[in-house]
Amino acid sequence: MKKVGLRVDVDTYRGTKEGIPQLLDVFNKHNIQASFFFSVGPDNMGRHLWRLLKPKFLWKMLRSNAASLYGLDILLAGTAWPGKKIAKNLGYLMKQTQDAGHEVGLHSWDHQGWQAKVGRWSTEELMQQVRLGVEALEKALEKPVKCSAVAGWRADERVLMVKEAFQFDYNSDCRGTHPFRPVLENGSIGTVQIPVTLPTYDEVVGTKVKDEDFNQFIIDEIKKDQGIPVYTIHTEVEGMSKAAQFEQLLAMIANEGIEFCPLSHLLPQDIDMLPMGKVVRSDFPGREGWLGCQQEV
């Protein structure tokens, strides 16, 4: 069996409220465990609308049919009214995910804020964002948070340095090919990174593949992956608008010798065996703006 890390990003209030119960039921049915990363603070995702002025983001929204894919309430959240606090109202679903045997970590306090402002926040502001997120998630889970994955893969060496204070077992902050130990700004070795290696639905539909062909496309990408495959889904997509399509994918992979697992299951017993690398800012196909990407050293 080819082991593939399955990462579930939970970005929004509605994605938590509606997408989590759907995915928990589907994963239980197919006997799958995954790593869930929750946004826990205010849902301000509608404030991304200003990015429509950027041609690359506008094209991404058009080709993925974003209004249908996400729903208008998600696209407008936190614009004309204050964003709802996700963990405050829906923390029980985060605990339910943990109790179902899945790995649970922090995605963000304010997902939209992190994507839009991380590059200009001070070190103190970055620290506060992570701290608020950790505290809210720990309150919901009633146990320490041991892993994290920053919103939108917006991470660089400065972000990694800030996150060292929280002593996570691993982070999944970047795109790349295989787990590694990041070299930090001060020359020290940071917390293990488990990069996402495979494209997400919204990165390739409308450019590389048609919607109806996506499942076979991602299976082919998994088979071609020569590193340590990690696949990201979103509750707002695979847990809602594309739930039926995603369940078809799970049925297909059962016949392809592919097994999904939590990200921590991809790590060796001795993490000192992992190679070193860096996380650097880079453009990425299908995404607007910079992402954190793995670089060999």
Curated annotation (Swiss-Prot):
Gene Ontology BP terms: 4-amino-4-deoxy-alpha-L-arabinopyranosyl undecaprenyl phosphate biosynthetic process; lipid A biosynthetic process; lipopolysaccharide biosynthetic process; response to antibiotic
Matches recorded under SUPFAM superfamilies: Glycoside hydrolase/deacetylase
Pathways involved: Glycolipid biosynthesis; 4-amino-4-deoxy-alpha-L-arabinose undecaprenyl phosphate biosynthesis; 4-amino-4-deoxy-alpha-L-arabinose undecaprenyl phosphate from UDP-4-deoxy-4-formamido-beta-L-arabinose and undecaprenyl phosphate: step 2/2; Bacterial outer membrane biogenesis; lipopolysaccharide biosynthesis
Keyword Hydrolase belongs to the record: yes
Transmembrane regions listed in the UniProt entry: none
Keywords: Antibiotic resistance, Hydrolase, Lipid A biosynthesis, Lipid biosynthesis, Lipid metabolism, Lipopolysaccharide biosynthesis
Domain of life (superkingdom): Bacteria
Catalysis performed (reactions): 4-deoxy-4-formamido-alpha-L-arabinopyranosyl di-trans,octa-cis-undecaprenyl phosphate + H2O = 4-amino-4-deoxy-alpha-L-arabinopyranosyl di-trans,octa-cis-undecaprenyl phosphate + formate
Entries under PANTHER family matching the protein: 4-DEOXY-4-FORMAMIDO-L-ARABINOSE-PHOSPHOUNDECAPRENOL DEFORMYLASE ARND-RELATED, GLYCOSYL TRANSFERASE-RELATED
NCBIfam families, A to Z: PRK15394.1
Function: Catalyzes the deformylation of 4-deoxy-4-formamido-L-arabinose-phosphoundecaprenol to 4-amino-4-deoxy-L-arabinose-phosphoundecaprenol. The modified arabinose is attached to lipid A and is required for resistance to polymyxin and cationic antimicrobial peptides.
Protein name: Probable 4-deoxy-4-formamido-L-arabinose-phosphoundecaprenol deformylase ArnD
Record organism: Proteus mirabilis (strain HI4320)
Gene name as annotated: arnD
